[in-house]
Structures are given as C-alpha cells and as structure tokens.
Curated annotation (Swiss-Prot):
CDD domains with a match to the protein in the record: IMPCH (cd01421)
InterPro entries with a match to the protein in the record: AICAR_Tfase_dup_dom_sf (IPR024051), Cytidine_deaminase-like (IPR016193), MGS-like_dom (IPR011607), MGS-like_dom_sf (IPR036914), PurH-like (IPR002695)
SMART domains hit by this protein: AICARFT_IMPCHas (SM00798), MGS (SM00851)
Pfam family, any one: AICARFT_IMPCHas
Record keyword Manganese present: no
Keywords carried by this UniProt record: Hydrolase, Multifunctional enzyme, Purine biosynthesis, Transferase
Gene: purH
Name assigned to this protein: Bifunctional purine biosynthesis protein PurH
Similarity-based family: Belongs to the PurH family.
One Gene Ontology term, aspect cellular component: cytosol
MGS-like domain span: 1-145
Entry-linked PROSITE patterns: MGS
UniProt cross-references to SUPFAM superfamilies, sorted A to Z: Cytidine deaminase-like, Methylglyoxal synthase-like
Length: 515
C-alpha cells in the first residue's frame, strides 16, 4: 500500500529536499497553500488538500485541513478493524506521516508595529490540530514539527521502510511540548492584552538556551532556559565576547550584578559581586576611577568575582582589571584596545556585552521562585524612590555630604541579602554585612569590614531596627548617619538612642528584604 504524507509548513527550510527524498521512496504527498506552491515549483508532485477533503480552502485559509478526511486518516488505529472499516466505508485514506510547523505567532508579536489583528490572524488552528491528532496516534503515525528531525526520519524510512516506535514516541512528545508552548505564548499575549494580573492558570514558555555541566553543586543536574519572548537586558540575551561557557552559579551571580547596576544610571559606576552579594560598588566621574573605588571597597572578596560596569570599558580601565582574577566582566561595550588587553593570556575570562539602554524594559517582568510543590510570583523590587519623600526622624539633619552618601548607601543595600547592612561613603562601599539571622550581627560584620575607613561613613539597613542595640553599635563605631525604612514598634527607642549620640537618622518608609 502506498504511504501518504501530509506536508504544510510555514518554515520552508529543507522541505523541498525532504519531500524529494520521500518521493524517491514511493510516498504520496498531500500539501496545502504556499507549501504546495513551493513543492510544485521544485518539481515535486503533490496532491492538493481540497482534492482530499472535497472542499476548497476558504475564509482566507482559515478552513482547509479541519475535515474528517484529514483527521480520520490521522487518528484511525491500524490495529482496530473497526477503525479501518470505518475509514474504508467513508472513503478516508490513511495518512502515515505529518510534517507541520505553525504560523509564526511569536515572530509576529515581536514586531514593533504589530497590530492586535495581525497577532490574531497568526494564531494557527489547523496546524496544531493535525499535529495533536498525529501525535496521539503515534503508534502508527510519524509526526515532525522541527526541520532538525527530517534527517533521522529519512534515515529510518530509507533503512526500514518505516520509523521505529521509539522515534515516533519521541517525536510525539516533542509535538506536545511544541503545541503547549505555542498555546502558552498565545495565552500570555491575550492575558497581557486584557490586563489580567492574577490569572487563575499560569502558563509560561521558555526555550532551552544551554545544557549545563551541573547546577549549584556538581551533584545537581541543571539547564538554562530563556524566555520565549527574550528580554534584551538579560544574561540570557547577553553577547559573549570571550571565555568559557557560563556556569549555573555564574548566571545567577551575573543576573544579580546587572540588577544592582540598574539603580546607578547617572554616573559611571562599577559593581563587584560574589555569591549574589555586592562586595564593592564604586561611583565616580569616570569609569576608571569608579573601578578603583569598587576594587578598594574589598580587594580580597573581589578575587574570583563578577564585575559589571555601566560605561564602555576603555584601555586604561582594562589594564587595571587585567591584573585581578575575575570570573566575568559585563559592560555595554568595550574598545578594541580594551578587549585586546582583557583577553591577553585570559582565554577563560568571560566577557559579556549588554544593551544598557534596555534596562528599563527589563524591570517590568515578574520574578518566579520555585518552592516544593509550588511557584511564587512577584514583581521586581524596582519601586521608584525620591529622597524628598524620606523623613529625618532625629534632631540632627544630615549634612550635604551625608545626604549624598545616604542616597548612595540606600541604593546599594537593596541588593544585600537580608538581614542586610552596608557601610559606605558618598562614592564607594566600605563594609557589607549580609545574610545574618539577627540584624546586630550584620551591623558588626559591616563595621568590622569598614574599620579604619569610618570617617564620614554612613550606614544603611534593608529593614527596620527591632531594638536600639543596633544604634548603640553604630554610634560606638563612630558612624554618624543612618538610613533605614523605619516601621518597628520600637522605632522611638532607636530615635532616642540616635539623638543621645548625636546621630542623624533617615526613614525611607520602604523595606528591601532580599532572600
């Protein structure tokens, strides 16, 4: 019995060659629309879909394959006489191979000038229906949705006259992933169009970006996926100019680094980071000096760290960085001379370029945190704050220099793991106290790191002080200015302690926990 294939693709890559090989193997080919035109033009004989259905394509191609003669040919079980008899009685010929890919919905909605009508028109109906019918009946039908699978199908057909069950099952699984992702993207688009912020069903679709050697630890398997609709300012979209493949921990740290620097837009800034905590932030009138400040913040912890710069890397800055062992450097761009310096004898140094002008768009997407049996969803902590809204709660007002330093410190503390404390001046971090289970311990760690550099220093806390003992420790160290959210039932005790020691303290009214 002559075998039949149905081919209807939007992506024509490789389809003519695939169809030519099928014809050599004696297959009949049913085709539709533009695919039929392409195959006929290449000399591949095809059967028009309306010759199979008895109905013309209609409604601008919206209705062409949704017909019992198509789906009966796909769904009929070859092992059931009743199915085969029903097909025969209704003049339904069996279809053994389906090659379909779908209307380019993703590519359409990514166009900057796309209209809602264009998006709707590029929702495929018949294609997913054929794919799902064929995949359901994979015991008998081979289904191909990805041109990358053409070769293996042809190899098996040439060798055995049919594909193996294992191949058909694998391809069916691929189809169900593909159609699920396609529908998820449509659902995401429509959800955004109607402004639904808390959908009762959450559908997400990501594409495999990188199969990883391992995860956070060698005993953990891991992979890296990218959003189906990519975010330009993201590690997933970064252009890698040099170095080894990014590891799991590299990606998490690099993501934290590029989030931090989004808050330092207006002056040249360098952020150094280790284990998702900033270990040095420097700000200056030029990027080379900003590097100096970031490095001087903690010359020990920066070893093996990640550095992100918000200005082009020039040769002078590259020379300074070249002398320090770093895992990753991230910047908007690099001069040719800077790249030559950084890559000299450092083939493993990972160098990434990112479009910093796309930072604002990256702040919109939600954050997803997996928990056992569930998923937490929240928007990013990107609230826009103004010092004009802050409240000085002590008798002493900050000096102009202290006010500048407090603003710098408040930007920096946002990304320190809770309980988080940071000590800074007006242009660099001096001490970081991250992740302690009691706040006074974080205060002591940050102050200890900053010792001998506390003249003119200020301190920021990511959340309120539960007791006045924090202020006591700060005053004892000689720090004269504090910024924190406020909000404790014992705020007045902390205020009184600050007044007692002549400190100035600012309440922002905004907490920045980070876990």
């Amino acid at each position: 019995m002559t075998k039949r294939a149905l081919i209807s693709v939007s992506d024509k890559a490789g389809i003519v060659e695939f169809a030519q090989e099928l014809k050599k193997l004696g297959w009949e080919i049913i085709s539709t629309g533009g695919t039929k035109v392409a195959l006929d033009s290449a000399g591949v004989e095809t059967i028009a879909i309306d010759d199979v259905t008895g109905f013309p394509e209609m409604m601008d191609g919206r209705v062409k394959t949704l017909h019992p003669n198509i789906h009966g040919g796909l769904l009929a079980r070859r092992d059931l006489d009743s199915h085969l008899e029903a097909a025969k009685d209704n003049n339904i010929e069996l279809i053994d191979l389906v090659v379909v890919n779908l209307y380019p919905f993703k590519e359409t909605i990514l166009k900057p000038d796309v209209t809602y009508a264009d998006a709707v028109e590029n929702i495929d109906i018949g294609g997913p229906s054929m794919l799902r019918s064929a995949a359901k009946n994979h015991a008998s039908v081979t289904v191909v949705v990805d041109p990358a699978d053409y070769a293996v199908v042809l190899d098996e057909l040439s060798a055995n006259g049919e594909t193996t069950y294992e191949t058909r099952q694998r391809l069916a699984a691929k189809v169900f992933r593909h159609t699920a992702a396609y529908d998820a993207l449509i659902a995401e688009y429509f959800t955004a169009q109607v402004g639904e912020s808390k959908p009762e069903k959450l559908t997400l679709t990501y594409d495999l970006k990188q199969a990883m050697r391992y995860g956070e630890n060698p005993q953990q398997d891991a992979d890296f996926y990218q959003k189906a609709l990519p975010t330009d300012y993201s590690i997933a979209s970064a252009k890698q100019l040099n170095g080894k493949e990014l590891s799991f921990n590299n990606i998490r740290d690099a993501d934290a680094a590029i989030r931090i620097i989004r808050d330092f837009k207006y002056r040249p800034t360098v952020v150094a980071l280790k284990h998702m905590n900033p270990c040095g932030i420097g700000q200056a009138d030029d990027i080379k000096t900003a590097w100096d400040y970031a490095y001087e913040s903690d010359p020990v912890s920066i070893f093996g760290g990640i550095v992100v710069l918000n200005r082009e890397v020039d040769a002078a800055t590259a020379e300074k960085m070249h002398g320090v062992f770093l895992e990753i450097i991230i910047a908007p761009s690099y001069t040719d001379e800077a790249l030559a310096i950084l890559t000299n004898k450092k083939k493993n140094l990972r160098i990434l370029a990112l479009p910093f002008d796309a930072q604002e768009a990256s702040e919109v997407e939600a954050e997803y945190t997996g928990v056992v049996g569930g998923l937490l969803v929240q928007n990013q902590d990107v609230v826009k704050e103004s010092p004009a809204d802050w409240q000085v709660v002590t008798k002493r007002q900050p000096t102009e220099t202290e006010a500048t330093a407090l603003e710098f410190a408040w930007k920096a503390i946002k990304y320190v793991k809770s309980n988080g404390i940071i000590v800074t001046n007006d242009h660099m971090t001096l001490g970081v106290g991250p992740g302690q289970t009691n706040r006074v311990a974080s205060v002591r760690i940050a102050i200890d790191q900053a010792k001998d550099r506390l003249d003119g220093a200020v301190l920021a806390s990511d959340a309120f002080f539960p007791f006045a003992d924090n202020v006591e420790e700060i005053a004892k160290a000689g720090i004269k200015a504090i910024i924190q959210p406020g909000g404790s039932v014992r705020d007045q005790e902390s205020i009184e302690a600050a007044d007692k020691y002549g400190l100035t303290m600012v309440f922002t009214g905004v907490r920045h926990f980070r876990h």
